[in-house]
Amino acid sequence: MANDYLFTSESVSEGHPDKVADQISDAILDAILAQDKYSRVAAETLCNTGLVVLAGEITTTANIDYIQIARDTIKRIGYDNTDYGIDYRGCAVLVAYDKQSPDIAQGVDRAHDNNLDQGAGDQGLMFGYACDETPELMPLPIHLSHRLVERQANLRRDGRLPWLRPDAKSQVTVRYVDGKPHSIDTVVLSTQHAPDIDLPALREAVIEEIIKPTLPADLIKGDIKFLVNPTGRFVIGGPQGDCGLTGRKIIVDTYGGAAPHGGGAFSGKDPSKVDRSAAYAGRYVAKNIVAAGLASRALIQVSYAIGVAEPTSVMVNTFGTGRVSDETITKLVREHFDLRPKGIIQMLDLLRPIYEKTAAYGHFGREEPEFSWEAADKALALAEAAGVEPAVQVA
């Protein structure tokens, strides 16, 4: 890669239609896990103008009012007026859930005992990543993109910018020099708005109240290109502007394109699905590698076969930044982390109703107390085993 290059990531707000769908799916998952933590859940959501469709496969003993959960989630996001794209009070909600296929269940149903040989719920490959670009050990472009739309939502909710509406998108381009963030080149922010706000006032407020307070001062060098609502108008938004579907923002959910993605979405899936749980474990492993000082960048790939507990492969790539060899780090990963599906569930305590919070602003790089995969609690053990000093202070 060139020594001087630009890299871009994007995020979307909680009011983006695909994120509305993700949040409904994870709200339903949480409600089910709160009653029956051994449920099998694959909850998919579609939302369009005035319509929400709930479908997928659910096997549970829980008694859940799915329609009310969907309405409550839409209300929490802020869609309480048809002018915004959907109204939680008046939208139709259709429910079409089946049970999990018994052919799949027979390979993963050993979850009620201490047998760690519970098989993976599907085949697939998952990635985890961490780097030292931010204190959260995340790539800078996706980190800033999330913080922009998160601030947009906060200013909308507290009334400081009352003309903001729930739907929004952000995009940040960072200039890298010698592999490190050097400066911010371009920021794009498109936000849904009330029809009576004029464009110059909107652009000034977004730049001064949302964008500038979010950007790190040490990365503001020269003129930054600010592109705010570049089409000129964004009144029609949310599910009215675009049909929303669960699982369509998988790059937003992870590393903003800075790392590969195995293709499996997260939201609506219980942790027996390795699409979700193994991706969380990959982040946990990668973050501990970087926090331990073993490397400044770490990419982990794991893969599984349906019904088989042991991963079919584990790979570590530190892109030449490792203080010990990638082979040594891979050996340490196998020694310190149980990457069998049941082992992951126990290691990260994943049978909890914690998932709705993950469904907007990124599954990774957020210091939420429920996000066990963000802990660096194995960094010291890894550092000691490798004979290096930890890169971050570890309690």
Swiss-Prot record:
Binds 2 divalent ions per subunit. K(+) binds at residue 44. It is an enzyme of class 2 (transferase). GO terms for biological process: one-carbon metabolic process; S-adenosylmethionine biosynthetic process. Residues 100-110 are annotated as: Flexible loop. Its main location: cytoplasm. Catalyzes the formation of S-adenosylmethionine (AdoMet) from methionine and ATP. The overall synthetic reaction is composed of two sequential steps, AdoMet formation and the subsequent tripolyphosphate hydrolysis which occurs prior to release of AdoMet from the enzyme. Belongs to the AdoMet synthase family. NCBIfam families: metK. This is S-adenosylmethionine synthase. The gene is metK.
